[in-house]
């Protein structure tokens, strides 16, 4: 049986490079988006992505990696609260695409 816990993120052991940390961030966001589209409305995911970029990157002048990190934090909280409130998705509740029927939507722009 494999260990379900996540590995120590890059940057904590002193052996990783900044590039590996950015790759880890991108992989983590993509994995979270793949899971989130099965539980949350695609409009919510898209708007959180757009507003994160508009506020953190455009208005505040933060770097793209910081903007992605803030998006990751917001989406993790949204998915956590969804599960905490009693998600029935694991038992076949809402299908792919969140609360709407149809195929799962594509991930937000820039995360393909």
UniProtKB/Swiss-Prot annotation:
It holds the Pfam family VPR. It comes from the Viruses. A motif (Nuclear localization signal) lies at residues 65-72. Residues 61-80 are annotated as: Binds to human NUP153. It is found in: Virion; Host nucleus. Keywords: AIDS, Host nucleus, Host-virus interaction, Inhibition of host innate immune response by virus, Viral immunoevasion, Virion. Its main location: virion. GO terms for molecular function: identical protein binding. Plays a role in nuclear translocation of the viral pre-integration complex (PIC), thus is required for the virus to infect non-dividing cells. Targets specific host proteins for degradation by the 26S proteasome. Acts by associating with the cellular CUL4A-DDB1 E3 ligase complex through direct interaction with host VPRPB/DCAF-1. This change in the E3 ligase substrate specificity results in the degradation of host SAMHD1. In turn, SAMHD1 depletion allows viral replication in host myeloid cells by preventing SAMHD1-mediated hydrolysis of intracellular dNTPs necessary for reverse transcription. Belongs to the lentivirus VPX protein family. Interacts with the P6 region of unprocessed GAG. Interacts with host VPRBP/DCAF1, leading to change substrate specificity of the CUL4A-DDB1 E3 ligase complex. Interacts with host NUP153. This is Protein Vpx. It comes from Human immunodeficiency virus type 2 subtype A (isolate Ghana-1).
